[in-house]
Amino acid sequence: MNWKTYALAHAKLDDPNETCGLVVIIKGKEKYFSCKNIADQPKDIFIIDPSDWAAAEDCGEITAIVHSHPTTSPQLSMADKVACEKTKLKWYVVQPNLEQWVEYEPCGYRAPLIGRKWVWGVNDCWSLCRDYYQEELGITLRDWDRPTSSDAFLLNPFFDSSFHATGFRELEP
């Protein structure tokens, strides 16, 4: 069996939640490495457990990310495309009920400044600011790692301190 068979079985098992995994080269062969989805809303998004990512890296070379869209088409969302660019890895999306696959490779995609769907950590307020400065002013701003959920961010809102570290200064009126 090829790795897609295992990934599809994983997606069917966890339906209606999104599943996630990695394609890893182990002893010259592509293998599917299932990962835990640690997202707070696993029916809508996925976040690969960092310990699973580390374990996969220990086994071999990670060449792709796999996740499922159990209730929508396997076409990548705007947030999926942005995240794919950030990882610089090939992505595969499977729709488990239809057994349909879509493959996507990084190609320089950037979400539009107007009309992007808000997704925490991918297309959120900071990414909009960062992308605006890059596209309109040619200024590259740091991309900050976010907590895994917006609720966790509310407990520790670090963007106020991040603005200063990014180079912004408060001006006197």
Where in this protein do the model-derived segments appear?
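Conserved beta-strand-loop surface patch within small alpha/beta domains used
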Residues: 1-62, 71-106
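A short glycine-/small-residue-rich loop at the edge of a beta-strand within enzyme catalytic domains
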Residues: 43, 116-120, 124, 153
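Active-site nucleophilic cysteine motif
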Residues: 118-136
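Short acidic alpha-helical/loop segments enriched in Asp/Glu that coordinate divalent cations
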Residues: 138-149
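...with weaker cross-activation on analogous glycine-rich loops/strands in unrelated enzymes
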Residues: 147-173
